Amino acid sequence: MKLPKPIIPVICTVLLLCSSAMQAQLPATAEGLEQSRLVTRATMYGVGLTNVFDTYLSPQEYTGIDFRVSRESMRMTRWMDGRLSLQSFFQADLGYTRNKADNNNTFSALANWNYGLHYNFPITDNFKLLAGGLADLNGGFVYNLRNTNNPASARAYINLDVSGMAIWNLRIKNYPLTLRYQVNLPLMGVMFSPHYGQSYYEIFSLGNSSGVVKFTSLHNQPSLRQMLTADFPVGRAKMRFAYIWDAQQSHVNDIKPPSYSHVLMVGFVKELYLLKNKRKK
């Protein structure tokens, strides 16, 4: 049966209106799915200044340059009504330092991985605060080029950190900008440290390993990591500038190996959407 020509435009209009009405009902559900599956990833490279002072190797302070790379992933979860966000942050740095007498050098390296959750507290539509906890894993070394008996010092420690963030989405003359400040404070953990004057040969070959793993907290490991980032679009890409202030301090087994770093970093940000892996039975 053929429809009269005047009715065809009416039917098309009704179908379009129904389609629009159906789409208008989707955002509430679709937005929930997007928030829990939208992953923000950033890779950055940076350079800065570092101070290394390890009394196990030398009583002198060494200063120099720090090269650093980082990889971060953040996404919202469905836990606690979608208020919990998951963060994974990995960074590795390599330092080359020299003493004040200008007659000796050291190489230092440290890999750090943070993984944990933050609860989101929206203050306004553009500003929110986050608070949570992170697992904090660290491993590295300091190598003194002139020492012969004990040329290197290992660094290995695990912490439970308290962490906080402030994220602000703003516009400067219609140009979008996202600012973030994050601070991580180690609350408690365990650290490997030889006794002062004890060689690694005694620990691993002779078995004199008593007391080389110690409990740490604010009283003997007052450390702090702070990071300030700025995300902004450049064409179709999104860039990130970051400043990291990394202060690692401890006083365990009469050894003090503090290190302080100020690093400027730059990189790119990607936003990915995780799809469900549907398997056919």
State where each predicted segment sits.
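Cleavable N-terminal export/targeting peptides
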Residues: 1-37, 274-281
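Residues on the lipid-exposed face of transmembrane beta-strands in outer-membrane beta-barrel proteins
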Residues: 67-77, 111-119, 133, 160-168, ...
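Outer-membrane beta-barrel transmembrane domain signature
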Residues: 149-236
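Short glycine/proline- and aromatic-enriched beta-strand/turn motifs that initiate or cap beta-hairpins
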Residues: 24-87, 281
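Predominantly the C-terminal beta-signal and adjacent terminal strand-loop region
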Residues: 176, 182-184, 192-194, 214, ...
